[in-house]
């Protein structure tokens, strides 16, 4: 096995782990929705879409064979994480300033018309308000945890990729 093959295998494992973590986060959100009765707002649903896209691109990237194709999907993962961080950041802002509505009247029909809301309404249909406070987990709200997760993806994916490929140059 060549050095490049070993390093690309490591990147593939990172991507598979990232995809599994994103699916676990969506599973946790569904658990909180179904079992704990915490209704998802439009911004929550958009964050779920971002996590799902990150997982999808991570799994596809892990299936790629060339460095260039893996890089393309790593870039897509980072773009989705940046979008997710933007949504989560706005959600955190909305929770700190409840007078600022997330626009449930505007966003709800748009989010509810997305394809997954029709296929899997339990997981991707809006049912709550963005300013509704839920009990924090380890001192942070769900929106804050989502922001942390997205920022970690934005930082760690390029960092791990560049460190992994540094010796190949």
From Swiss-Prot:
InterPro entries for the chain: DiS_bond_form_DsbB/BdbC, Disulphide_bond_form_DsbB, DsbB, DsbB-like_sf
Superkingdom, natural source: Bacteria
UniProt GO cellular component terms: plasma membrane
Spans within the Periplasmic topological domain: 32-49, 90-144
Cysteines engaged in disulfide bonds, as pairs: 41-44, 102-130
Major localization class: membrane
Keywords noted in UniProt: Cell inner membrane, Cell membrane, Chaperone, Disulfide bond, Electron transport, Membrane, Oxidoreductase, Redox-active center, Transmembrane, Transmembrane helix, Transport
Function statement: Required for disulfide bond formation in some periplasmic proteins. Acts by oxidizing the DsbA protein.
Family (UniProt): Belongs to the DsbB family.
Membrane topology: Multi-pass membrane protein
Protein name: Disulfide bond formation protein B 1
A Gene Ontology molecular function term of the record: protein-disulfide reductase activity
Pfam family, one: DsbB
Subcellular location: Cell inner membrane
Residues in compartment: Cytoplasmic: 1-14, 65-71, 164-169
Record-annotated membrane-spanning stretches: 15-31, 50-64, 72-89, 145-163
Entries under PANTHER family matching the protein: DISULFIDE BOND FORMATION PROTEIN B (PTHR36570:SF3)
GO annotation terms (biological process): protein folding
